[in-house]
Amino acid sequence: MDKNKIMGLTQIEVKERQAKGLVNDFTASASTSTWQIVKRNVFTLFNALNFAIALALAFVQAWSNLVFFAVICFNAFSGIVTELRAKHMVDKLNLMTKEKVKTIRDGQEVALNPEELVLGDVIRLSAGEQIPSDALVLEGFAEVNEAMLTGESDLVQKEVDALLLSGSFLASGAVLAQVHHVGADNYAAKLMLEAKTVKPINSRIMKSLDKLAGFTGKIIIPFGLALLLEALILKGLPLKSSVVNSSTALLGMLPKGIALLTITSLLTAVIKLGLKKVLVQEMYSVETLARVDMLCLDKTGTITQGKMQVEAVLPLTETYGEEVIASILASYIAHSEDKNPTAQAIRKRFVGEVTYPMISNLPFSSDRKWGAMELEGLGTVFLGAPEMLLENEVPEAREALERGSRVLVLALSQEKLDHHKPQKPSDIQALALLEILDPIREGAAETLDYLRSQEVGLKIISGDNPVTVSSIAQKAGFADYNSYVDCSKITDEELVAMAEETAIFGRVSPHQKKLIIQTLKKAGHTTAMTGDGVNDILALREADCSIVMAEGDPATRQIANLVLLNSDFNDVPEILFEGRRVVNNIAHIAPIFLIKTIYSFLLAVICIASALLGRSEWILIFPFIPIQITMIDQFVEGFPPFVLTFERNIKPVEPNFLRRSMLRALPSALMVVFSVLFVKIFGASQGWSEIEISTLLYYLLGSIGFLSVFRACMPFTLWRALLIVWSVGGFLATALFPRIQKLLEISTLTGQTLPVYGAMMLVFTVIFILTSRYQARK
């Protein structure tokens, strides 16, 4: 090998490449840019339609009715500020988890960020690390998982001169490699550039609201023109009045408030979790977490502490005593590049003189469950799971497994090691058993019990022997510890058939972990997966939500939705419940927002239909103006729902968000429609003035909205009672203030309208209580 290559680039060569732009600066970030945040909050369908309506109102100089647009601008500004705060939190936490690349420059090893690499850099990679840039192997041997690029789960062997593809990761082994491509020339970058579709947002709430927005977006222009022409031509109203009335109907149909509150709530959850040392790399995963009903756990580092220690070494033959076994293990582990927790535990225990030089090495693989090394003067040494290397069961191994220990067998063969066709030899001889303990994480039992009490199904998926996993699960208080299967002895078809009913899966390969998750998803479960090793990556990517430990392999942190910076499994319930808080509270207050959407649509249809009847006295003009709706929104849709979204609510999430919310909002919307028709007809028969009719409708509209606020605040607490008093008090104070009355084009309820208001609200309250109780029973 060229010694200059091993020395790496000089600083002069690095600067030359930087000047030419040969830098690895094409990196995908978990955090969006500031410009993307601004675009997402400003350039939306809602804002475009609101802007068009505002232009129409400005054209006719209806300045007082443009207050709604100031609220829209404030909401957009608030969204930007909240999202920037969340971005700052995510960026800050990302710095804590960002993995450096070991790079050789001027003969010295330095740690660089992936984007600091230049063409020709020499990098050192080991098992568990993601490949930051396309590179050619200079030295070493590794097995690489390219599933994230090619979809193939089989490991690909990489020897000298082989090309390592960026975005893949080392499943085993270690190599020295030279950067072959940088930036947009990398294989992973080309895949991103060639992709014609953007990954859809995984949010059922936002998808539901998008459906509603799509419907209103299609009808809003024809409805707007119809309402404008009706008022202008058929009713003969001035242009200003026609624009104002038709604009109100269109504004009411847009469910903008609930969409903004949903995003704000999710961003707030990101910030809250960040303060608890949980990095949320995908905002909408918070909502997905709320819907999780099946949590799949990797045993190591989740239920256990992930702090392996060699408890005992048991020789199995008189030929090789304890001293010889220790010497073999010391040589094996000194030459080994394996850095998994088991290898680290052996390395810590067997530190000594290297007796046997290494000829060749086959790193440990989670697919094979063993590794091997050819040692000079000894033969080929194997280290791995007894059941994967030996034909017959060793009684001592069974006893250790039942104690909850991880058991490895040290074995010897005189056959040559073949990297290309790794298989156990026919002459293999067991030399010793290694019993390795991994203490159970403190509080794991309470956490598992709590999750079960919250209707979250639990499954343990591990590469360990199922007897070991079962024993540990029993100690951790796992109820179904007796329900286990050895996945190394069953077919994929059998695994699919057993996935739903079995609780513990042992000796699972990475492919099988993924298959279990796929099967559970097909059965209708929303799945979450916890893990920390490269053998978990395929399953983590397949799960609806992936949670990894910060102490785990770097490649797992790159693809996870959430990273536990404290690496503490006991944080999982709080993360789950933060998601439930957001989703349940949004579903709880959504009917308050949808009342306006429904009654605006129904009244617009009635107004257009009345124009088609042909009689001018039957023509109904939309009865509200924008400033009235905006003022009521501040006390009904504004402060109360916003405050209620912060309350703790950890009950399981109910399905069919939009359907349930629309049905709960429908009675109130129908009350508004009835109020408009009744007051218009009855008021005309009684000779009421337009200001009296407008005043009564304003009070009825606000009061019907408050019925939904009251329902959302049940059961009452002191804080909720104060919230209602503040909202109702603010509504009445503004409605009774003379200057604001002039702005709202209303007055005070009179001796004629007050009794009608009281009677109607009494009837509406009774109907509201009855319908709410009926819906609650369903």
Q: Positions of the model-derived regions?
A:
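Helix-interface capping motifs at the ends of transmembrane segments in multi-pass membrane proteins
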Residues: 48-70, 218-255, 267-268, 272-277, ...
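Actuator/coupling domain of P-type ATPases
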Residues: 3-8, 14-29, 74-77, 85-88, ...
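Hydrophobic alpha-helical transmembrane segments
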Residues: 64-98, 105, 202-297, 451, ...
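Transmembrane helix-loop-helix hairpins at the membrane interface
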Residues: 23-102, 346
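Conserved beta-strand/loop elements of the cytosolic catalytic core of P-type E1-E2 ATPases, chiefly
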Residues: 78, 108, 180-183, 196, ...
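Cytosolic catalytic regions of ATP/NTP-dependent phosphoryl-transfer enzymes
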Residues: 291-429, 436, 449-450, 458-470, ...
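Cytosolic catalytic regions of P-type ion-transporting ATPases
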Residues: 98-207, 490-499, 503
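Membrane-embedded transport module
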Residues: 227, 338, 480-528, 543, ...
